[in-house]
């Protein structure tokens, strides 16, 4: 009898051409995206996890609940009141907290509020109105650079001890880097000689659009000059700031609340106080 030749292959000795994708253990399989490096997805997951942990630790160690802290922070940054006034307002609501504790809350959460709010702002247009105002810090006058677009939407701000070309360049770089801004087509400024020098150097280095136009027309800056009052009226009850860092953090909170109240946040009205409170609670992942 003739026996047909057959290939007997043991499972452990299976040649490579007989192995299918289904027979390979899942731990040995990896999928590669044409646009993503092998370790990128894992690094992104770690970054997301770290961000979630940072948000969870936002109110860790505080002796008051998150809703009380955010209520105090929101009201201080919204209205021209002092820390002692806010202490009495909280006491009227049966919350006993010292005004120095409220000060620490503002220093801790004002900058964080401004940072988390930026991705939720509507896009501004390319017509910038730039001006600087004065803020008293430890008995000295400092310069607060501010910029709004033609519709009055806040673009960015910067507190500086000097008023020169380097300070103007730092401000322009900071403003262009924000997620809700575009490279400007026109920049309207006052007669300060530092602005043309800063704009020319940044165009040469490719940091500003080479066709952007710098206009030194004073009356066109009425929009930003009128917008200064949102910050000036809030800083008056405090009679100035004690240090540069204290001023920088507090002003960041003032500007963030001004953006919200001007209706710059997406789908949030400027007069809808309840929606604004929910937005701030959402930014800090707290139940409103």
Please state what every model-predicted region is.
Residues 2-137, 170-288:
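Charged, often Cys/His-bearing segments associated with DNA-binding zinc-finger transcription factors
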Residues 154-155, 184:
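Short, solvent-exposed beta-strand edge segments and adjacent coil->beta transition regions
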Residues 63, 162, 166:
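Conserved phosphate-coordination/catalytic loops
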Residues 80, 138-154, 164, 172-176:
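Short conserved beta-strand segments at catalytic cores or DNA/RNA-binding microdomains
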